[in-house]
Amino acid sequence: MGKKKPVLVVMAAGMGSRYGGMKQIDPVDEYGHIIIDFSIYDAVRAGFEKVVFIIKKENEELFREGIGARISKKVEVAYVYQDLNALPDGFSVPDGRVKPWGTGHAVLSCRGVVDGPFAVINADDYYGSHAFAMAYQYLTSEDEQSEDGKYHYMMVGYQIENTLTENGYVSRGICETDTDDYLQDINERTHIEKRGEETAYTEDDGKRSEERR
């Protein structure tokens, strides 16, 4: 049996909560394209033939009409729901919790739909064509497990200065790698911004300390 083709998993369950509504279906250019259109276009060019959207069930109709119906003309599309209550045995939802769980829980929602190599992206981020080309090349050239039984993973990283904006601060996961470019750690910085020609972050809105790199 040949190796299964990579699938693109798109996390979209938190779209409405992060932006106060489904703003990601609003056009970003004069041709009516939305952000996810660019990612799907680049993914298909790289070789991906199937996309799985992780969504909230209550957003399904709006999502299908605004995104899925158009994209399904170019690539196979499937949907899964990120259900707050869909937890492994022994876990329960804390009282008052309404916000979706994180990335791990979102990807867990794909069990039964994704059974081969896959890449995961956010629906509302722009990655660039190189990211999908690198991911697809890796997923089609590497075995899922090595001889010692360990799974293989990869991540596309970006130079921090290329991900900043002139319009305030951003949150980013800062990656630490070893000399062979293997990931060692990720530290979330929630307030990173440009300060002149430098990049700075603070953990307390600048009240006590500031580090630059």
Name what the model sees in each region.
Residues 1-16, 30-120, 127-134, 141, ...:
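Conserved N-terminal catalytic core of the sugar/cofactor nucleotidyltransferase
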Residues 21-22:
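Conserved catalytic-core motifs of eukaryotic protein kinase domains, centered on the activation segment
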Residues 25, 77-79, 153-155:
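Conserved beta-strand scaffold positions in the cores of enzyme catalytic domains, especially
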Residues 26-28, 32, 114, 136, ...:
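Generic secondary-structure boundary signal with a strong preference for alpha-helix termini
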Residues 121-124, 158:
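Active-site flanking residues adjacent to catalytic metal/cofactor-binding acidic residues
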Residues 129-213:
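Conserved core of the sugar-phosphate nucleotidyltransferase
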